[in-house]
Amino acid sequence: MRARQSIRGGAGALAARGVGKGDRVLVYLPMIPQAHIAMLACARLGAVHSVVFGGFAPRELASRIDDAAPDVVLTCSGGIEPKRRVEYLPAVAEALETAAHPVRTVLVHHREGFETALADVDGRGGASWEDWGEAVAAAEPADCVPVKATDPLYVLYTSGTTGKPKGVVRDNGGHAVALRWTMEHIYDVGPGQAMCTASDVGWVVGHSYIVYGPLLAGATTVMYEGKPVGTPDAGAFWRLIEDHGVRSFFTAPTALRAIRRADPEGELLQAHDLSSLRHFFAAGERLDPETQRWIEGLLGMPVIDHWWQTETGWAIAANPVGLEQLPVKIGSSSVPSPGVDLVVLDGLGEPVPAGTEGNIALRLPLPPGTLPTLWRDDQRYIDSYLSAFPGHYATGDSGVVDEDGYVFVLGRTDDVINVSGHRLSTGVLEAALASHPAVAECAVIGVADPLKGQRPSGYVVLKSGVPVPEPGSEAEAALLDELRQAVRRDVGPVADFRDVVVVDALPKTRSGKILRKTMRQMADGEEYSVPSTIEDSAVLEALAGVLRPAR
């Protein structure tokens, strides 16, 4: 009831500032309840929300303001990271001054502990800056506005892109139908039960399974502003499960690798009662087999890997545990979801035999809940997704479907490297490196080679407690040789795997995806842009000296 009152009040505050059906509202908030309230307040009015990950740089925020053309921006004083506080108001003010599109109003939720006050930014960017709490208190609560099933609910900009951002459009009707179905049949969560999705509302996972999915199912959703490690330790997820009686938990593989690195023996898990937990899900990037086996061993239950994209809004391939759980195959996202006609094609668009790697595509039409277009750019939608293989949606991922119909996603198509004419998936090479007991996580890229075209180059992060050998020492030479032998054993000499180095950390987006393309561009001496979604640019800077391996 309190949530409903807050949403009605928030919708009333927006309506009082001229926001109505079809108008856009940009939401720039961290993982706090006000983000959830803001999104649902927009939906109540038929307005289109566009959530931007809290902490994005002003330039990137400005580009999204120009594309979405919002009337109102909803933000707060700042966000809290494990080692710092991020001031939001100066970033919003700079973005408004940079953007060509004029924003009428900025509503600000006050949080204690931040330096910038509302008065410090008042009037900047030509906008009216107002206190959110005061605006809600003074507003008349708003009723729901009817919308068509095909009216847009939100626009969400994809991460890791350069140039003009791609605004994925989600419609109302298909989205609601798909999420309601998946909550019951994929995640096995119903009324009164709790689901915890350790993501962010700035990403599609947060939209679908922190905000809308649990609401449509009548379930409890757990919002968590912290991190898998460091807030306060690597037992944070286990504490959430115990404290809130979580039935289904959903996170990204990068979080699991971070926990494994900090607590490789899983000692912190032992202090918590996880008896409520029935299912543990992973998605967002490839779940390497070594990490999957590790977490399964700790939990004593299968880890359900599944695969989807910002564009699809829900799982392309999944294990329907709410219907009947299928046997789990390590490294597989299970089987195509109902309504998804998944095929694997060669470069000419012809289907390949079972067990053969190729381009993963979806035969049209796409199922409910997937993107109908890109915001104000139908032609870019056609060019980006529908042109490579006519009659199909091109996922941009490569993979294999085995004889049992299980899908194995091996990586983005630009993550396939060509060594002397042999196409090798970086995912396969990374799985071999990750099998070494000292490795917490790793990345492999293809670097230019004058003789072979490309050579694989590996970068590994060691587990917590494993000593990092001195450069040039016998210990380092022994470790690197073991890593080379692991690849030779699992992949074969065809990989010609020689270049491998130990690093402190890998560069990632805030959603946990490793920036392999940027690493490859740096290694090859190409021009590159640091993606706006990068979690810590200092990690990339630290790698600059090691990304070009010796020839």
Name each model feature, range by range:
Residues 13-62, 194-201:
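Conserved AMP-binding/adenylate-forming
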Residues 106-111, 123-157, 164, 174-179, ...:
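Conserved pre-ATP/AMP-binding loop-to-beta segment of ANL
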Residues 44-134, 253:
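Structural core segment of the AMP-binding/adenylate-forming
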Residues 348-349, 451, 497, 503-523:
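Flexible lysine-rich "adenylation lid" loop at the C-terminal edge of ANL adenylation domains
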Residues 27, 52-78, 92, 242, ...:
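AMP-binding/adenylate-forming catalytic core of the ANL superfamily
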Residues 335-339, 350-385, 424, 527-528:
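Conserved ATP/PPi-binding loop(s) of AMP-dependent carboxylate-activating enzymes
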Residues 176-194, 204-247, 261-263, 267:
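Conserved AMP-binding/adenylation subdomain of ANL enzymes
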Residues 219, 247-250, 260-327, 341, ...:
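Gly/Ser/Thr-rich phosphate-binding loop
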